[in-house]
Design a protein with these regions (language model features):
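N-terminal, positively charged/glycine-rich alpha-helical extensions of SAM-dependent methyltransferases
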Residues: 1-15
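A short glycine-rich, Lys/Arg-flanked "PGG" loop and its adjoining helix->strand segment in the class I
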Residues: 121-136
Length: 241
């Protein structure tokens, strides 16, 4: 996917308002959209499931390196993060088994990863624990069209226990965990839909230019049509401890 869309270390679908030119811009815009929910960018911030480190690196526009933490379950991705964001605290750690002390962070950001966690509830409970009073959690996430979808890709998705039926159920989960001032926006038409159309267009352009063959075209189209069918709302959320 990165090859087709020209990503530069990002691993997210992006935010695509009118005028967005490419995937890299969309990925940056999604992070910026989330950071707008943190008006005072001070103190310590944690980048959960930081991927290859592009999002962590961009946090350095707002925070000194010593105040930026990043975690990922993949040692390889943490090595990349350490290269892209030198001076930050990049650690191999499971998002549902975080070992930080209580009330350690002022802010937490998590971009398109919570649907991988076993489970969201455990992650939210731990995030609530390690946030300072008044601290904020901001994240983007996707819900799936049915609980059974979680069984289709067991290597990527947790059990159906992680399934949430609706945006209202998503909001309620935050409140049950103890978060307040919960805001959940449904932005599928500005996140997934334009990304999907961009990807399909690029695939056909590469095929027409003979850069890929018919088999690769059909395999990738099948994958993306399946992703479109299995995903439901794409959400952006902000909550305060």
């Amino acid at each position: 996917m990165a090859h087709f869309l020209g990503e530069e270390g990002f691993r997210n679908i992006g935010y695509w308002p009118p005028g967005t030119l490419d995937q890299n811009q969309a990925s940056e815009q999604l992070q910026d959209y989330l950071l707008n929910y943190i008006p005072e960018k001070k103190g310590r911030i944690l980048d959960v499931a930081c991927g290859l480190g592009a999002t962590t690196r961009r946090l350095l526009k707002h925070y000194p390196a010593e105040n930026v933490w990043a975690i990922n379950i993949s040692e390889k991705q943490i090595e990349s993060t350490r290269t892209l964001a030198p001076g930050c605290h990049a650690l191999v750690m499971n998002a549902v088994e975080m070992t930080f002390e209580d009330a350690f962070f002022d802010s937490i950001i998590c971009i398109e990863a919570a649907f991988h966690f076993e489970t969201r509830r455990k992650f939210l409970e731990d995030a609530q624990r390690i946030l300072k009073p008044g601290g904020r959690l901001v994240l983007s996430d996707t819900l799936f069209s049915a609980a059974a979808r979680h069984t289709q890709f067991p290597q990527l998705l947790p059990s159906p226990e992680n399934h949430l039926e609706s945006v209202d159920a998503y909001r309620k989960l935050f409140e049950e965990v103890g978060f307040r001032s919960v805001v959940v926006e449904e932005l599928r038409d500005l996140i997934w839909k334009p990304h999907f159309l961009r990807f399909v267009t690029v695939l056909h352009e590469r095929f027409a230019d003979r850069e890929i063959g018919i088999v690769q075209l059909m395999e990738n189209l099948a994958m993306y049509y399946e992703l479109d069918a299995m995903t439901g709302p794409w959400v952006v959320a902000c909550a305060e401890k």
